[in-house]
Structure formats: structure tokens, C-alpha cells
């Protein structure tokens, strides 16, 4: 293996490789930062360009776009509470709070640092333990997917702020919204009201933009917050070594969580981000800071979602199974280049594969370098008065929502959920649990029903499979431990 890695490293050392990594990363960051323009869109749009390229150059450019877009979503999530991608929704919780406090520069730097750490750890795991992780990933069936989704849903209690009941209500509403469209098992229309646009369900991007961006803009207009002071001025302070050190363990843990989840086909960066965020809050010594401007919260979210980038290649390269939409496109790109993903790929195209895997480490290094430079430009956004920014943000939101399906209906969905988000926020109901339930709802429902069909209606199937049982135990602990911790704190406060 070591000789293959060294050969891949030598093969990577080409000006052409680095130029296209640089260009791909720049394009990816721009796509990620613009609401509605996802990594999938970037990779799909530029894939035809790579057909005439050297396989290493073409695939590395597409991977650069993937990593860049995953990181880029955090920029607008932090600066204007408009996650560029669903994977950055958890980042907006603490990132925007820090921006309002005047620490947006620190938030952006933490997001960049955590994204780089997550991406590099994921790339290293791809390089060294891909076959082992692929074996674990293929053992996931419907019961395991249900248990994983259930574990993800328990995070609702962590992201509900001070009122868990309101968070659970929003989670229930999100689950209901996720049921709109054709039944995933029987194909029967549900909650469509005979409207043809609802048959396919609601797209995540318009819902995300509405709940976060539009609702926030309505709030600003209502309060007439049009001054620069509405988004507090960035202080010139930088992220300190002690702050990086304090969040480094969180980054490592979240990167591993993201890598494990990313290796499981059909999951994705959004799920990894929320699970990493919930776990970081659960073990934190200061959980009360989460939601009001915690650097640990940003570190967990960004390390988690970027930990997915390399991990999704594990089932793709070793088994020929794409982990998400981006790797499904990469599957086509590899096949057009004459490489058929699967167990024999390492024997037939070992040199090319190891060059790509080593190159993924350099992709993340380029992300850090380019991100460092771009942060200086992005912070200037907060200097622009909000009465100029609001029309620009609305235009970007409309463009992003429309771009999903080239349908005006998605723009209407965005506006509707903007109003929903504003009304619920007005009465103290957090919208993040609703978004999490919309993301995880389809996986939870479909996998649960498939499991019950397999077991002829017996719930024993969830308790007789080791991985499934482990996630169920984690779900119970995720709910029970915070309650026990709160009770202990209450008893201590009473004795004091």
C-alpha cells in the first residue's frame, strides 16, 4: 500500500493537476455560497468538460467542486443566515449569532479550519481503511437506516433551545411536511389536495431558503433594521490558538462521525452535520452556549459535513455504490473514463485511484488556502447597509429556489415557508427542528415500513441486529442523559 501511495503522490505532482484543483475549488465555493446552487449542480454542470481530460485531472477538479461547495455553504449561513446548502443549516444556528455579536470573522475562520480538518481526516480514512469501512456500510439494511434516522431525530431536543416542547412540536410538523407527495411504499398520493406540483413532494432547497433566509428578512423589515449596526461590525480579532485548541477534539470527533455516516450510502452531509452538532452539545461543558454563538457548534457542524466528502467515495470505489447524488455523477464520470468502480478497480487502475485519493488531501489544503483569502472579501458583506442587502438576498433566494427544478412553484414554496418560519419564530418556536425532521422524515418512514414488511410486522427486527440495536441505545441515551444532567443541575442550584 505504501508504495502505491508514494506512486500516487509522485503522479499528482503536476502543474496541470494543481491548476484544475484551484479552479474547481473556486467554482465550488461560489456554488456553495449562493443559496440553492448545490455541490450536485456544480459537479453535474462541469462533468461534460472533463470527458476529454486526463482522468486524474478531471476527477480531481470535480472533487474540488464537491469539497468547495460543501464548505462554501457555511459562508452565507454565517453572514446572512442563509445556508448555501442543506449541509450548512446547522452552522447557521451559531454562526449567525456570532456575526450579530461582531465575531463573524472568527466564525468564518472556525468554519474554514473545521472544514479542512474534516476533509483531511475523511481523505485519510479513504486512503487507509476504505475496504473495512465499505464492509460495515454494506451491512446497513432498512432497520439500520431507521435506527440511524431515529438517532438523528433525537437531536431535536438539543437544537430546541430552552423550550423542548416547542421543538418537539416543530419536529412533528416537519415530519408531517415530509409526508407530502407519493407514498414511498404504495405510491398513493398523500396531502397533495389534487395539486400536480405536490405529487413529487416539496423540494428541500426552497423549504430551507424560506425557513432561514426569507423569515429572517421579514423580521428585519418588520423591525426596520436597515442599518449596518443590525449586523454588528466585525472586530479585527482573529481566531486564537487557544480557541482552535479548545475546539480541536470536537473537530476530530465530528470528522469521524461525518466519515462513518458518509460511508453509508443514502445518508449525506446534512444528516452528518446535525448528528455531529447534537453530539458536540451533549458532551459539552457549556451546552447553554450552543444556539447563542458557540465556536464548538460551528466546528462540529462543519467538520461533520466535510467529513462526508471523502467517505462517500468509499462505497463508490470499493463496491461501485454511490454514497450520494454527487458520487452518482462521479460514477458516470469514472465509467466514461473507462474505469468501472468495484472490487477489481484497485487492480486495474490502482495508480490513477491512489493519485486521486492522495489528491483529495491536497484538495482540502487548497480549500484552506483559497478560503483564507476569500474570507477577507466575504467579511465586507457585513459593511453593506441592510436596505441594499435585502433586495440582493431576495434575488439570490428566488434564483436559487427556481434553479432546483426551473419551476415557479418552488419560488412559491420558498415564500410560503418564509412566512411559516417568520410566524413560528415570532411565537418562540424554533424552525431548525422542523428542517431536521423534513430531512430525516423520509428515511425514517420508508426504512421503518420496509423493516416491518421484511419481518411480517414484528418489531423484534430492530432489536436483533447489532448495529440497529446500538443506534437505538444511543437514541435512548441521547434523550435520557440531558434530562438526568438537567435534574442534577436543578438539585445543585436548590442546595446552593
Tell where the protein language model's regions lie, with residue ranges.
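Membrane-embedded alpha-helical segments of transport systems
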Residues: 67-72, 113-125, 133, 177, ...
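Re-entrant/interfacial helical elements at transmembrane boundaries that shape
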Residues: 39-48, 62, 77-97, 128, ...
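A structural-propensity feature for long, helix-poor, extended segments
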Residues: 66-77, 84, 294-319, 323, ...
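Transmembrane alpha-helix interface/packing and boundary motifs in multi-pass membrane proteins
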Residues: 25-39, 68-81, 156-161, 255-265, ...
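Membrane-embedded alpha-helical modules
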Residues: 109-226, 336-489
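Helix-loop-helix hairpins and the membrane-proximal interhelical loops
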Residues: 1-58, 138, 189-294, 379, ...
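Membrane-interface alpha-helices at helix entry/exit sites of multi-pass transporters
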Residues: 56-60, 97-114, 285-297, 326-328, ...
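Short helix-coil transition sites and intra-membrane helix breaks within transmembrane domains
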Residues: 31-40, 78-88, 121-125, 261-271, ...
Amino acid at each position: 500500500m505504501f508504495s502505491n501511495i508514494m506512486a500516487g503522490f509522485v503522479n499528482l505532482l503536476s502543474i496541470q493537476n494543481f491548476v484544475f484543483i484551484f479552479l474547481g475549488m473556486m467554482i465550488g465555493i461560489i456554488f456553495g455560497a449562493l443559496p440553492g446552487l448545490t455541490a450536485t449542480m456544480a459537479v453535474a454542470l462541469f462533468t461534460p468538460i472533463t470527458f476529454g481530460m486526463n482522468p486524474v485531472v478531471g476527477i480531481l477538479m470535480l472533487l474540488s467542486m464537491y469539497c468547495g461547495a460543501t464548505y462554501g455553504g457555511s459562508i452565507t449561513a454565517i453572514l446572512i443566515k442563509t445556508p448555501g446548502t442543506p449541509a450548512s443549516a446547522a452552522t447557521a444556528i451559531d454562526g449567525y449569532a456570532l456575526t450579530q455579536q461582531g465575531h463573524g470573522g472568527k466564525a468564518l475562520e472556525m468554519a474554514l479550519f473545521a472544514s479542512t480538518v474534516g476533509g483531511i481526516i475523511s481523505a485519510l480514512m479513504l486512503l487507509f481503511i476504505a475496504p473495512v469501512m465499505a464492509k460495515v456500510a454494506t451491512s446497513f439494511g432498512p432497520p439500520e437506516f431507521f435506527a440511524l434516522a431515529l438517532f438523528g431525530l433525537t437531536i431535536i431536543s438539543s437544537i430546541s433551545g430552552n423550550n423542548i416542547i416547542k421543538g418537539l412540536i416543530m419536529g412533528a410538523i416537519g415530519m408531517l411536511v415530509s409526508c407530502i407527495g407519493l407514498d414511498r411504499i404504495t405510491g398513493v398520493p398523500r396531502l397533495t389536495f389534487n395539486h400536480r406540483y405536490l405529487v413529487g413532494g416539496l423540494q428541500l432547497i426552497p423549504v430551507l431558503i424560506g425557513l432561514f433566509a426569507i423569515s429572517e428578512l421579514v423580521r428585519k423589515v418588520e423591525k426596520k433594521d436597515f442599518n449596518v449596526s443590525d449586523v454588528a461590525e466585525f472586530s479585527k480579532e482573529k481566531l486564537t490558538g487557544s480557541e482552535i485548541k479548545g475546539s480541536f477534539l470536537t473537530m476530530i470527533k465530528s470528522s469521524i462521525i461525518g466519515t462513518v455516516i458518509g460511508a453509508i450510502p443514502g445518508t449525506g452531509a446534512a444528516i452528518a452535520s446535525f448528528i455531529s452538532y447534537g453530539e458536540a452539545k451533549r458532551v459539552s461543558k457549556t451546552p447553554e452556549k450552543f444556539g447563542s454563538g458557540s465556536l464548538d457548534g460551528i466546528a462540529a457542524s462543519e467538520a461533520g459535513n466535510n467529513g462526508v466528502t471523502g467517505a462517500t467515495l468509499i462505497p463508490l470505489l470499493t463496491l461501485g455504490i454511490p454514497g450520494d447524488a454527487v458520487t452518482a455523477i462521479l460514477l458516470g464520470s469514472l465509467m466514461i473514463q473507462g474505469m468501472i468502480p468495484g472490487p477489481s478497480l484497485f487492480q486495474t487502475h490502482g495508480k490513477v485511484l491512489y493519485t486521486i485519493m492522495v489528491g483529495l488531501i491536497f484538495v482540502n489544503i487548497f480549500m484552506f488556502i483559497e478560503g483564507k483569502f476569500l474570507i477577507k472579501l466575504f467579511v465586507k458583506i457585513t459593511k453593506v447597509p441592510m436596505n441594499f442587502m435585502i433586495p440582493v438576498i431576495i434575488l439570490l433566494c428566488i434564483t436559487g429556489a427556481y434553479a432546483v427544478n426551473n419551476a415557479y412553484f418552488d419560488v412559491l414554496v420558498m415564500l410560503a415557508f418564509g412566512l411559516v418560519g417568520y410566524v413560528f419564530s415570532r411565537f418562540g418556536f424554533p424552525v431548525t427542528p422542523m428542517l431536521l425532521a423534513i430531512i430525516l422524515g423520509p428515511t425514517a418512514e420508508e426504512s421503518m415500513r420496509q423493516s416491518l414488511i421484511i419481518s411480517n410486522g414484528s418489531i423484534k427486527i430492530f432489536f436483533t441486529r447489532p448495529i440497529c440495536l446500538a443506534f437505538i441505545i444511543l437514541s435512548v441515551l441521547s434523550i435520557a442523559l440531558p434530562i438526568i444532567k438537567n435534574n442534577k443541575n436543578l438539585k445543585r442550584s436548590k442546595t446552593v
